[in-house]
Structure formats: C-alpha cells, structure tokens
Amino acid sequence: MWTYKKTLQYPVNIKCTNPKLAKVIISQYGGPDGELAASLRYLSQRFAMPDQKSKAILNDIGTEELAHLEMVGSIVHQLTKNASIEEIEKAGLGAYYTDHGVDVYPQSAAGVPFTAAYLACKGDIIANLQEDLAAEQKARATYEKLIDLCRDEPDVVDPLRYLRQREIVHFQRFGEALRGVQDKLAEKKFYMNCDNMQTSDCGCNNNDN
C-alpha cells in the first residue's frame, strides 16, 4: 500500500515553452531506459527476492521511480502546455499531437510506444539484479545526454540533475542488494556441502593406530 503526497519529490518549475525538448525528455517517461520501465521492473522483481532486505530495496527504489515518473511527466507537460500549433509542428510533434494532443503519453524519443518488453524479469535473482545495475547506469547516461541537450534552459536542467543523481544512488543500493544475495547464496552452498559430506570425509572415524 502506498501513501500519495500531492507534491513532487523535487520541484519542477519550468517557465519556458519548448516542445522540442519535451520530445526528447519524454523518453525518460516511456522509453526503454525510462522511469515507467524501471518502476515496473523493480516492483515485479521484488516478489522473488530471497530475503526481506533485498525485497525492501527493490520496493523502495521501484516506488521512488514512480515519483520520478511523475516528475518527468510534469517536465514534459510544462514544456508543452502552452505550445502553439506552429511550435508543435516545428518540434516534429505533429504526429504525436494528432494522436495525443498535449497529453503525456509513454513513448521513447523516437516515438516508439512503451512496451512490456522493456522489463527484465528473468527468474534468476543474480541476473535480475545485474540487469538492475545496468538499467541504472543506462538511465544515468540518458539523463546526462538530456542535460547536454537542455543546457540553455536552467529550469529544465535542475530537475534533470536531481534525477541523474538519484540513479547513482540507486546503482549503489542495487550493488548492496547484489552483494547481500551473493553472500547468502554462498553461505547456503557451504552448508549444503557440509550436510552432504560423508562421515569418512571429515576424518572422524579414522583410526590413528
């Protein structure tokens, strides 16, 4: 169960209208490395985590990604809400406007609609966590590219920098989860080997005479 607060995790106060920037930023809403894919991936993977700590980490990060989704949606909305038809057409958003107006629709910067194929739930704990580490690095790299593209709009860059920093924190927390799971698996394997050991293997019945 979640408790919703009617405030963004970090303020988004954009004064300019720039649908051209919205066209690329929307990739972090519904693109392959975006916040929607991340939130669904982590919240789905959490069920199979082997202990409460790793489940809590995925639950926490998946929940925060929903907050980031809201932030990205707010950025896109504020960049387009007052755009004229001419500005929309000039930004190359004529097809988008035809289907969605200025609603925030989950798609990539290239216009590819969101798909569940972006999720990674492999049925292998280590593989899932390795995927999560890679996902955070890809998201960080995407935010860095967006910051470069938005360099002349400080109101846009500010929340993007915040989101980039959170991806770094998430990467560190997934590393913590992976180390914990690997330690538990190694410990389990050690005890299984001990349980399967024959008495003669430990030398307990050896006769010194």
Per-region residue spans from a language model:
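Non-heme di-metal
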Residues: M1-N209
